[in-house]
Amino acid sequence: MWFSRKQAVNVAPKSTAGGAAALPKQVTTKSRGDAAESAARAYLVGAGLRWIESNYRTPGRGGGEIDLVMRVPDGTLVFVEVRQRSSASHGGAGASISAVKQRRIIFAARHYLMRFASLPPCRFDVVLVHGALSGGESPQATIEWLPAAFDAS
C-alpha cells in the first residue's frame, strides 16, 4: 500500500536561557541523522503511534539496524527506516533505500522478533525527511511518511 502523508515542520533550534538559539558546534552526518530520527519519532507519535525503541542493532558484523520501532494502536509492530537529505541533487532521501538496505532492515526485524513467543503483525514504514534540519534562522523540513513502504517477502 503506497500512500504518503507530508507535513512541513519547523525544527528551529530551541533558545537558551540568554535567548540565543542553541546550534550544534559541528554539524556531522550523525547529528543530522539523529535530528532526522528525532523529528520522525515526534511526527509518528503525533500521528498516534507509540515509540518502543530507537536504533536497534543486530549483534556482530553484517547485521542491520532499525532506526525506530513503533506500535500502532491495533498492536501492529512498525519497523521504521528514516532517511534524510538536505537536497535532491542525488535523488533525494527515498532514492537511498536500496534492495540491499531493505534486506538488512528485514534481517534486523527478524532478529528483533525472536524475543516474542507469538509474532505480532508487523510492517515496514519509511519516513523521508526532505530539507535541512539544522542551521539557518528558521530551518524547514518536510516529513513524508510512507506506511507499509516495503515488505519482507
Curated annotation (Swiss-Prot):
It comes from Polaromonas naphthalenivorans (strain CJ2). GO terms for molecular function: nucleic acid binding. InterPro entries: Restrct_endonuc-II-like (IPR011335), tRNA_endonuc-like_dom_sf (IPR011856), UPF0102_YraN-like (IPR003509). CDD domains: PoNe_Nuclease (cd20736). The lineage of its organism: Bacteria, Pseudomonadati, Pseudomonadota, Betaproteobacteria, Burkholderiales. HAMAP family: UPF0102. This is UPF0102 protein Pnap_0271. Belongs to the UPF0102 family. Coiled coil: none annotated. PANTHER family: UPF0102 PROTEIN YRAN.
